[in-house]
């Protein structure tokens, strides 16, 4: 048997049915002629496919999640003497029986889940690439830009937003001795968020950081006057950008992230 025609019918892209058919056909010594019929939404299309399949003595394999569409195809194909194989329906029915849960009957769910997964991975990779001001070009590409002095949770917040909200985040450290990148003044202020912290809180955090590294907590890094100088520089930069400032002194990463996400969503509404 050469080039047996198989019509792959789906209410979405049809990738699932296509893969299953190819896997099954791979067990036989003939080359299948697989013809995909995607995004089927009405019985008229099904009737047409049945007619064509009959004239070509073809097999129909389908993934239709809506029960009425599945039943129509099976019934009408049988009337015309056309073999129609339901790839996903019996499994959906079995899972419903075992769990007692009603299916959503939404076409293309797997595809949407795959897209969400890859968006998350892309966002995580972006956060790593443009962490700590490594490449200023990321500022203009980012969904969100975080700015702040050292130890204001820029990196963990970037990763949290990437992993949980699928947002591409670049973060930029501010140091008095180094001019901020020009891109920081070019980005839309609505995308930019300054992370502020009290001198006392930051002094404690930095001292603990130095201790964890086996260093003296008397270093300039944890000096209160140095910290105040850095905060003054931060205030000067954010005033020029005119971006929203969030006090992270007593906030968990999740809380700060929610403030940012809500701000972004509100901007999109108006």
Curated annotation (Swiss-Prot):
Belongs to the pyruvate, phosphate/water dikinase regulatory protein family. PDRP subfamily. Bifunctional serine/threonine kinase and phosphorylase involved in the regulation of the pyruvate, phosphate dikinase (PPDK) by catalyzing its phosphorylation/dephosphorylation. The keyword Repeat does not apply. InterPro entries: Kinase-pyrophosphorylase (IPR005177), PPDK_reg (IPR026565). ADP binds at residues 148-155. This is Putative pyruvate, phosphate dikinase regulatory protein. PANTHER family: PYRUVATE, PHOSPHATE DIKINASE REGULATORY PROTEIN 1, CHLOROPLASTIC. Keywords: Kinase, Nucleotide-binding, Serine/threonine-protein kinase, Transferase. GO terms for molecular function: ADP binding; ATP binding; phosphotransferase activity, phosphate group as acceptor; protein serine/threonine kinase activity. It catalyses: N(tele)-phospho-L-histidyl/L-threonyl-[pyruvate, phosphate dikinase] + ADP = N(tele)-phospho-L-histidyl/O-phospho-L-threonyl-[pyruvate, phosphate dikinase] + AMP + H(+); N(tele)-phospho-L-histidyl/O-phospho-L-threonyl-[pyruvate, phosphate dikinase] + phosphate + H(+) = N(tele)-phospho-L-histidyl/L-threonyl-[pyruvate, phosphate dikinase] + diphosphate. Its EC number is 2.7.11.32, 2.7.4.27.
């Amino acid at each position: 048997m050469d080039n047996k025609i198989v019509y792959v019918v789906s209410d979405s892209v049809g990738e699932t049915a296509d893969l299953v058919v190819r896997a099954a056909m791979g067990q036989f010594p003939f080359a299948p002629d697989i013809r995909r019929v995607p995004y089927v939404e009405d019985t008229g299309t099904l009737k047409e496919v049945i007619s064509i399949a009959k004239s070509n003595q073809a097999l129909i394999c389908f993934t239709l999640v809506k029960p009425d569409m599945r039943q129509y195809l099976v019934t009408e194909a049988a009337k015309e003497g056309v073999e129609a194989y339901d790839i996903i329906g019996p499994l959906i029915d079995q899972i419903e029986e075992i769990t007692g849960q009603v299916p959503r009957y939404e076409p293309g769910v797997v595809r949407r889940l795959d897209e969400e997964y890859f968006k998350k991975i892309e966002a995580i990779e972006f956060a790593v690439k443009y962490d700590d001001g490594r490449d200023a070009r990321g500022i203009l590409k980012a969904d969100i830009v975080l700015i702040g002095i050292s130890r204001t949770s820029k990196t963990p917040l970037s990763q949290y937003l990437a992993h949980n909200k699928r947002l591409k985040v670049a973060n930029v450290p501010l140091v008095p001795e180094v001019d901020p990148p020009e891109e920081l003044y070019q980005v839309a202020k609505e995308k930019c968020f300054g992370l502020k912290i009290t001198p006392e809180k930051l002094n404690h955090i930095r001292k603990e950081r130095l201790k964890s590294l086996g260093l003296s907590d008397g270093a300039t890094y944890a000096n209160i006057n140095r910290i105040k100088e850095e905060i003054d520089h931060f205030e000067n930069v954010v005033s020029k950008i005119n971006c929203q400032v969030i006090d992270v002194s007593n906030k968990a990463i999740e809380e700060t992230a929610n403030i940012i996400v809500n701000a972004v969503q509100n901007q999109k509404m108006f």
